Amino acid sequence: MAEIIIKKRHAIKKGQLTSLMTKLKESIGDDAELYTAPMIEIAETTSRFNIYLINKKPILMEKDEWAFPTLRGAILRPFSGRRIVVDMGAVPYMVNGADIMRPGIVSVTPDVKAGYPALAVDESHGKPLAVVLPLYDADGILALGKGKAAKNLHYVGDELWNLEL
């Protein structure tokens, strides 16, 4: 990810909030309620995502068809579901931005869908390591013998993680 430059930043309107919450509810279900706040700002950036700020922290990210918590959002406001658990041997690669390969996957929650973000967590502590875009549904990932299972979108230490406002 290249350096993120904020072009514009403003509070979102009620209609935008409704659209955002609908997309978020599709992604993480009823846990979307964890991400409501009196004021949510949108930061239009040079990155491939729109970033939503709650209390001046980048908590949510949105692309055309989906919205999902950033790693900071997942840590500050933990939610259940949409998880791919990776073994501890994969952790050093994940935090350097590597995609998830099938041999490193321990388990997958059944709600993981191809093309919609999921959270990659370590098997020991369940700590979020990355936001990934699965290439297959949960059953497809588990059926894979080898190969790439998910693309890394946002990881600990990348530009979005280090974004300070």
Tell me the role of every PLM-derived stretch.
Residues A2-F49, I54-S107, D111-A114, A118-L165:
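Beta-strand/loop-dominated core regions that host nucleotide or nucleotide-derived cofactor-binding catalytic loops
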